Amino acid sequence: MSKHRASRGKPTVTTTKRQTSPAARKHLKEAERLIAAGQSQAATAQFQRAVDADPTNVDLRYKFGKHLLGQHEQELGILQLERAIRLNDRDAAPLLELGQAYTATNRFAAARGLLEKALEIAGKASQTHLIYGTFLHKQGKLPDAVAHFRKALTLMLECPVEATVPKRKEDFDKPEVERLLWTTLSQLALAGVHAFAAFGTLLGIVREGGLLPFDKDIDLGLPHNELDLAARCLVANGWAEVPHAFAVNPRSFLHLKLQVTIDVTGFAVDQQSGTTYEGIWIEGIPAEWNRLTRWDTISLVKANAPDGSPIWKLEDPEAWLRTLYGDWRTPDPDFDTIIAAKNLCGFSLMTQCYALGRIYARWESGNLRKALAAARHSLRHLPDDELLLEVEQRLSGMTSEPSQRRESAA
């Protein structure tokens, strides 16, 4: 039986370690070297040799499973984690990792038992509550999710993390990705879909003259009632819908050749008020729990891509950007549209889930500046929240920035 005990406020959970056989240790060391050298695919074979040499080692199975999940080998990773748990079902780290993998594939019933056992074993570890909060969030159990995210941050306050300078990926503005954007917009237009460049994609085009180098996906907007037509068009042109999405809006697709993700967001008009709304919403929960943004009438005009093909675009892109970002002309690397959009409809339970989860994740990774920015964005809406005030004060001290109180958003 595991002798794991989570220390007070410990952010992460580790496996119970036992001595690894010399042969397995050799292969594990080589796998870690290959990963450090950016050869993750080659490391897979070394992990396999390691577990073959020491098949009852829980820590090896856990590391191999986690590696496979990181390589998008979902089912193979799950298989290794399941074997680790069969070897020791009281080890919190494999329970949490497998619970996350089940949650990511919407196997909520299977995830529940694992995560509840992890809470029993490692309930004083902040990471346990973060993962359980995410599990609840995906199912639309937002009040309980918020409670666990808050518990994770409360425990994190007891175990501060040092600041790091994270390396930003800055190669999204490749010519082939930009060509893919224009080609996709044209394909959608020809299929009868009124799709337009939106969010970070639009910001890059208008402000920088191209895609933002540190962006991570292509963002398109369209009328909500055209989402299904857009999905059929995208699938017919080399995209595959990302499986196991929990929200009905937006919808995400992966380009199978270029491995680029596109987020397609539906904008809906309230027939009574005439107001346009966009956001992240889940079916079967109260409407006010969802994350929504409010827009004036969105007007599109016909245009042409750089190669002359027909597309749709916003009639007044600068006004659209101003509604979302405020001062969109000044780069702000810490701006997070999900929680800081200027046109948010309040600070709903879902928005709180994203805000609390992102504060935690950035803090845990050592990106304290972004964690602090997320805390301050949250305080604009919840200025008297004692936990957020304490988090903001702690992060301010850790980043040598003066603590500040933000006035409530209008």
Where on the chain are the PLM-derived regions?
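Active-site nucleotide-donor binding segment shared across nucleotidyl transfer reactions
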Residues: L185-I218
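Catalytic metal-binding acidic patch
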Residues: G209-A230, G308
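Conserved catalytic core of two-metal-ion nucleotidyltransferases
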Residues: D173-L185, A189, V235-L314, F335-W363, ...
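Helical scaffold of the NTase/Pol beta-like nucleotidyltransferase catalytic core
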Residues: A104, K124-L130, T134, K138-A197
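Structural signature of tandem alpha-helical TPR/SEL1-like repeats
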Residues: I35-Q46, G70-R83, T105-K117, Q139-H148
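Short coil turns that delineate tetratricopeptide repeat
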Residues: S21, P55, D89, G123, ...
